[in-house]
Amino acid sequence: MTDTVFSSSSSRWMCPSDRPLQSNDKEQLQTGWSVHPSGQPDRQRKQEELTDEEKEIINRVIARAEKMEEMEQERIGRLVDRLENMRKNVAGDGVNRCILCGEQLGMLGSACVVCEDCKKNVCTKCGVETSNNRPHPVWLCKICIEQREVWKRSGAWFFKGFPKQVLPQPMPIKKNKPQQPVSEPVPAAPEPATPEPKHPARAPTRGDTEDRRGPGQKTGPDMTSAPGRGSYGPPVRRASEARMSSSGRDSDSWDQGHGMAAGDPSQSPAGLRRANSVQASRPAPASMQSPAPPQPGQPGPPGGSRPSPGPTGRFPDQRPEVAPSDPDYTGAAAQPREERTGGIGGYSAAGTREDRAGHPPGSYTQASAAAPQPVVASARQPPPPEEDEEEANSYDSDEATTLGALEFSLLYDQDNSSLHCTIIKAKGLKPMDSNGLADPYVKLHLLPGASKSNKLRTKTLRNTRNPIWNETLVYHGITDEDMQRKTLRISVCDEDKFGHNEFIGETRFSLKKLKPNQRKNFNICLERVIPMKRAGTTGSARGMALYEEEQVERIGDIEERGKILVSLMYSTQQGGLIVGIIRCVHLAAMDANGYSDPFVKLWLKPDMGKKAKHKTQIKKKTLNPEFNEEFFYDIKHSDLAKKSLDISVWDYDIGKSNDYIGGCQLGISAKGERLKHWYECLKNKDKKIERWHQLQNENHVSSD
């Protein structure tokens, strides 16, 4: 009964009864779980060598991985160098004097606290109080704080060290390959090829080729199957794995500089368990899947060492642009993708991603598996046009159409300096809950500089995969300069009441493509991770793009303190200046919870006494406060030209001095938009003039 069910003709995979068969018999009869019942002899290409185009694609992937590895090592090196400089510049002994600044501690000196990690004495200025579950406060010195930051930003906190990795060896390419006319019949016998060497235990040298190695390195049963389709080693890992594992190249020197890792990860039990778990999660190398090489007169083992059904499943980049018999075919197929796609990155947010929505899931992996492939490379039919290999590897292409689609519209109101984002609906979202549904919501960020200050979100809709929001989220204070350099990231997430919210998918749109005062509608398939297109970088892989984006976001967070919308009007009826504080946007977070308690202070200089100073109300726990308050200064119009208005934004704190967020100064001595705003106010009486001003980290007012 069991045999009848499993060997049904309608089943795609056939498993006969294996009770009377031994393991060797299964290999000879081509039976087992991995044997396809039809078309097996034509699809099996173990004796065919990889083409030069395929080898070039593999070499480009390896070069990208090495590039990312070098960038990761440089990034960690900068972190370590900064930490070492802090350690070298200590001025105290950590007992009677502060370990950092060297200030005297004790009864006659500053207050003393003990660092929780290094157990050294520091003053309260050089120590940082951290929150913990313990009832008493926990203090850390700035060196230990920096050490924890390095441990966190390098990813070593997860692995308790750095895992090792060995990159695949570059594939040798034979340039003087003889050509055969397509019209002549070619025998189907496989051509003999020189076996490929097995990967060494150390990292391979970039320039090593098959010709430079001796014949003694080409022995072993696994080496005879090198001309097979999948014999070039384990599949290349995704860029997200490469970013984590590439940091382990200099793990020994990093551990010595930090004193936090427990030696070589491969020598400790935890390191062995970690290495086993990492290797178990990856596909096994093709050379290990075939224990014996196939003989010319004997069919290959049922396991098949080919990594994909056809050439387009693994390498969708090799789309022939000329005839295969043309002498320039190799160069045309391997030309840089800048010439084919129009730039690094290769696609726009509104263009190609919409085209991808038309492809069914797994279209380019199953289409080539349906038809048998000829054995001879020169007579092979060109594969159907597919996407670039680098573009397909930049994100999870197999889930490009399974995450769902999002419909939204964008409108830039240039007169009011606002960006209106209308989230209409989503369709076919990926189920995230156990009931096969989701609780989706949409959140928006502006890149670079993503933070809570520019985060907007919709309401959450329960138990649906096809939500309809019809919500409009508005970004205020968006100038023409912001439209040229900002990118809008739209993320769809699943809300979880009892845990962390789960990410479903996202899409990004460069705001410089949006025309002012013209609404643009979008219906785009969600992607798991979308790389940013950056000019001047070769091989914009996902890991490199995210790393560059992380660097830009950190720079943006440091430079931008926020913006303030101010209105000025000189009233001839009241005989004075009316200053309106309308709102602030994208303020810097000053509190530990990631928010601020902002208020605005005004000071008309030179000093006119107490009547020259005004202050708004305090807005609690927000980075985008709305004040809508007006203040009146009784001053003659002729005297106003000699004055300057100082505007400062502060974070209110209880029990200590307020934190300065940023400010700006309007007056004759100002420059740019500030001077223009003040001049228009003096020129146009009884007319309210509103302007956005960038806050600067220049404090002109005391915190009292």
Curated annotation (Swiss-Prot):
Ranges of compositional bias, category Pro residues: 291-310
Binding, Ca(2+) 1: M432, D433, D494, D496, E502
Source taxon at top rank: Eukaryota
Gene Ontology cellular component terms for the protein in this record: dendritic spine; extrinsic component of synaptic vesicle membrane; neuron projection; postsynaptic membrane; synapse
Positions of modified residues (Omega-N-methylarginine): R229
Binding site for Ca(2+) 3: E549, D591, D597, D651, Y652, D653
Binding site for Ca(2+) 4: D591, D651, D653, D659
CDD domains: C2A_Rabphilin_Doc2, C2B_Rabphilin_Doc2, FYVE_RP3A
Low complexity bias spans: 279-290, 366-380
Domain annotation C2: ranges: 402-524, 560-693
Keyword Ubl conjugation tagged: yes
Bias-annotated ranges (Basic and acidic residues): 205-214
Annotated keywords: Calcium, Cell membrane, Cell projection, Cytoplasmic vesicle, Lipid-binding, Membrane, Metal-binding, Methylation, Phosphoprotein, Postsynaptic cell membrane, Protein transport, Repeat, Synapse, Transport, Ubl conjugation, Zinc, Zinc-finger
Annotated spans, Disordered: 1-52, 167-398
Record membrane topology: Peripheral membrane protein
Binding site for Zn(2+) 2: C115, C118, C141, C144
Compositionally skewed regions (Acidic residues) per UniProt: 385-398
PTM-bearing positions, type Phosphoserine: S277, S702, S703
Subunit structure and binding partners: Interacts with RAB3B, RAB3C, RAB3D, RAB8A, RAB27A and RAB27B. Interacts with RAB3A; this interaction recruits RPH3A to synaptic vesicules. Interacts (via C2B domain) with SNAP25. Interacts with deubiquitinating enzyme CAND1; this interaction results in the deubiquitination of RPH3A. Interacts with GRIN2A and DLG4; this ternary complex regulates NMDA receptor composition at postsynaptic membranes. Interacts with SNCA.
Function: Plays an essential role in docking and fusion steps of regulated exocytosis. At the presynaptic level, RPH3A is recruited by RAB3A to the synaptic vesicle membrane in a GTP-dependent manner where it modulates synaptic vesicle trafficking and calcium-triggered neurotransmitter release. In the post-synaptic compartment, forms a ternary complex with GRIN2A and DLG4 and regulates NMDA receptor stability. Also plays a role in the exocytosis of arginine vasopressin hormone.
Name the UniProt record assigns to this protein: Rabphilin-3A
Naturally occurring in which organism (per UniProt): Bos taurus
Source organism phylogeny: Eukaryota, Metazoa, Chordata, Craniata, Vertebrata
Gene: RPH3A
